[in-house]
Amino acid sequence: TINIALEMGYATGIHRSSLIATAFVLLLFILLLNIILYLIKGNHINFDFITSIKDLFFIKNIKKNINEFSFKNIKMKNVSIKSEILKYISIFATIISTLFLLFIVLFILIRGLPYINFNLLFGESNNSQMTLFPAIVSTAMMLFMSLIIAVPIGVFSAIYLTEYSKANGKLIYAIRIFTDSLSGIPSIVFGLFGMLIFLDLFGLGRSVLAGSLTLVLIILPSIIRQTEETLISIPASLREGSLALGASKVRTIFKIVLPCGFSGIITAIILSIGRIVGESAALIYTSGAVRYMPAGYLNAGSSFAVMMWMFSSEGLYINQTFATASILLMIVIFLNALLFVLNNKLKKDY
């Protein structure tokens, strides 16, 4: 992914084809991993298959070892000691990770907050200086366009998967494998795909519209899966009660199912907003990296994260880089706090 990000901007001919092939291999690798996980989860792979190839991989009969293993000689005192040791190890690991995260947050805020000012946020960005005002406008434009496309598609796709399709159908498994695979693909691969399709094929050029369409591809899998999991968690008795009272399938979905799953849909939207605001790799080659205000969706525009990358790459705007990072960090903290509050407010007990 690093090679794709660094070299795709100027690659041509065989060099560019090799980078595209690298992204394709990465996509196939992630897809293969998800297929294996689904087979294991669905008990399609068992230990008998593994033991049948033990001569190749030097794996002994796992089932036999498990069956012969016994806890009868383990004393309760030793179990208690091991449990205490595990508890303190877990506490220590939690403290270390929390302190490390807190150090990063405080370091960025201390370095960046003093340099956040009106001129940085709303000043004119030109050849002599760079400000965040074009990034604010570009990010807002991409947020609006990507969410207005991705949310309806994602929600209605989840409705189809949970309400109309067969629960254990092969098509459903295939769709879930592909959505999970897309969720695990690095964003630079989406950026490469967006550049090939929206820029080269459709001729949009590096524009806010091309970046927005690329963001749709990035956030759509998470919206589908989050909404689907929410709708699956709704008890079937609510649907059956509505249908028993004479309500149609469509009315049951819009009056019973969606209101009950509203908190999950909002969660998916908020997480998508955080992903969009912090996205950079996929947008460098689709929406562009410019310091000017976009005149419309067909013009190039830089998001917050791309503008931070531009600040750092210039070498003259280190303070502005930390200021932008502080703003992004505060946005993420605010979104997570909002998510926590809304989950507590909108959570339903069935």
For the regions a language model picked out, list residue spans one by one.
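Interhelical loop and adjacent transmembrane-helix boundary motif
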Residues: 1-27, 283-329
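Periplasmic/extracellular loop-to-transmembrane helix junction in inner-membrane transport proteins
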Residues: 6-16, 72-92, 106-146, 168, ...
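Hydrophobic alpha-helical transmembrane segments of multipass integral membrane proteins
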Residues: 29, 33, 137, 141-149, ...
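Transmembrane-helix boundary motif in ABC transporter permease subunits
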Residues: 33-45, 146-179, 192, 339-345
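Transmembrane alpha-helical segments of polytopic membrane transport and secretion proteins
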Residues: 36-96, 339-350
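Generic hydrophobic transmembrane alpha-helix motif, especially the helices
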Residues: 179-216
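Glycine/proline-centered hinge or cleavage motifs at structural transition points of membrane proteins
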Residues: 186, 245-246, 259
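Transmembrane alpha-helices
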Residues: 226-227, 235, 249-285
